[in-house]
Amino acid sequence: MMNHPHSSHIGTTNVKEEIGKLDRIRISGIGLVRYAFMAVLLIIAISTKTLPNTMIGAIFALVLMGHVFYYLGAHLPIFRSYLGGGSVFTILLTAILVATNVMPKYVVTTASGFINGMDFLGLYIVSLIASSLFKMDRKMLLKAAVRFLPVAFISMALTAVVIGIVGVIIGVGFNYAILYIAMPIMAGGVGAGIVPLSGIYAHAMGVGSAGILSKLFPTVILGNLLAIISAGLISRIFKDSKGNGHGEILRGEREDAAAAAEEIKPDYVQLGVGLIIAVMFFMIGTMLNKVFPGINAYAFIILSIVLTKAFGLLPKYYEDSVIMFGQVIVKNMTHALLAGVGLSLLDMHVLLAALSWQFVVLCLVSIVAISLISATLGKLFGLYPVEAAITAGLANNSMGGTGNVAVLAASERMNLIAFAQMGNRIGGALILVVAGILVTFMK
């Protein structure tokens, strides 16, 4: 019996229609069918160890994992509503894949090499800082910075005192709570935070820094995770509050901000211009850090951009170029960076080994205290409380640059990265100085 010629045509049409329906589901701009094909390709590459240990291999793995995990987290009810959405889900799931040995170690090495070794993180952060600062109105930027820094520093100081007092109440002692919870959680991350902090402690105590570092690392991990979750919660709970600036940090300046943030049409040449200018500021910060090693490079980067903006040293064409490049990086690489954080920085084994109820309580106290204090002070200093709590508060409990990105991604406030970095880097440097003095008396 012969098939009717129309039957095969109808079957082909139905398949195409089904594929078309699936392709309407888009993950970061890519249809589901095409995404599934690339995902299968990635799984085969990883399982056959043919994923290149290069920038290309890292980008392919991190972008695909980051986008799909973020998509899932953003659509899962509990994560979406209460646990920081796609940002937290991406970081947690990639960290769990590593902890359970589902993800091979060579993939972790490839991801870490791209983010830290090749310093893609540095490019991402400087692009974001430059973009967000140049996008702001000049007068508004200076007014916001002058009000923001006192809020950040006072919040950190008061939070440390609260942690110490709670440490006494729950039986671990004031000194322990300050040295092993307050200082590391607000020190500015790992490389610029607890690594030099462990050296300071080790020198004062006459012990090896490796043992000290193993005690400090869990604090940074849990503090970072709680900060990300809290940022998502705060932005959601206070969504309709008068204290929510919806991404604007300075109260009463929304009209000026809207005028300053006019739409910039994409231009291929300007994207390249924006890239090299962003890198130029990174080089300025790096070179000044070599001359003054006691001051973090990002502090110099922020200062150089603020001065450039304040004195109008860059024509609008170049400012727009930087803004444009920063937007491209944020929209396309944020999820990849979050996946990289989970793969290479969030060690679940270390975190679980350190868990005790006192440890968890003190980390929670740090999060709650710095959120409430910074929100209250922010309101007094003319900032929106929600934005103050996230940038002057929670960002100072995060894991440095990567933590700031995750905190702001969870709260959908990536445009405030400059303020998060400002408080985190300058505040972190102050923490190291204060810790160096305190450890002499508290050891």
From Swiss-Prot:
It catalyses: (R)-lactate(in) + citrate(out) = (R)-lactate(out) + citrate(in); (S)-lactate(in) + citrate(out) = (S)-lactate(out) + citrate(in); citrate(in) + H(+)(in) = citrate(out) + H(+)(out). It is a multi-pass membrane protein. It holds the Pfam family 2HCT. Induction: Induced by the presence of citrate in the medium. The keyword Signal does not apply. InterPro entries: 2-OHcarbox_trans_Prot/Firm, 2-OHcarboxylate_transport. It is found in: Cell membrane. The keyword Cytoplasm does not apply. Keywords: Antiport, Cell membrane, Citrate utilization, Membrane, Symport, Transmembrane, Transmembrane helix, Transport. GO terms for cellular component: plasma membrane. The chain crosses the membrane at residues 27-47, 59-79, 83-103, 114-134, 151-171, 177-197, 209-229, 268-288, 294-314, 322-342, 350-370, 388-410, 422-442. One of its GO terms (biological process) is citrate metabolic process. Uptake of citrate is not affected by the absence or presence of Na(+) up to 25 mM and is increasingly inhibited by increasing Mg(2+) concentrations. GO terms for molecular function: antiporter activity; organic anion transmembrane transporter activity; symporter activity. The record marks R425 as: Plays an important role in the generation of the membrane potential. The 46 C-terminal residues contain structural elements that interact with the R groups of the substrates. Interchanging the 46 C-terminal amino acid residues of CitP and MleP alters neither the specificity nor the affinity for the di- and tricarboxylates malate and citrate. In contrast, changes in substrate specificity are observed with monocarboxylates. Secondary transporter involved in citrate metabolism. During cometabolism of citrate and glucose, catalyzes the uptake of divalent citrate into the cell coupled to the exit of monovalent lactate, a product of citrate fermentation during citrate-glucose cometabolism (precursor/product exchange). The citrate/lactate exchange is electrogenic and results in the generation of a membrane potential. In the absence of glucose, i.e. when no lactate is produced, CitP catalyzes the proton-dependent transport of citrate and malate. NCBIfam families: ccs. Belongs to the 2-hydroxycarboxylate transporter (2-HCT) (TC 2.A.24) family. This is Citrate transporter CitP.
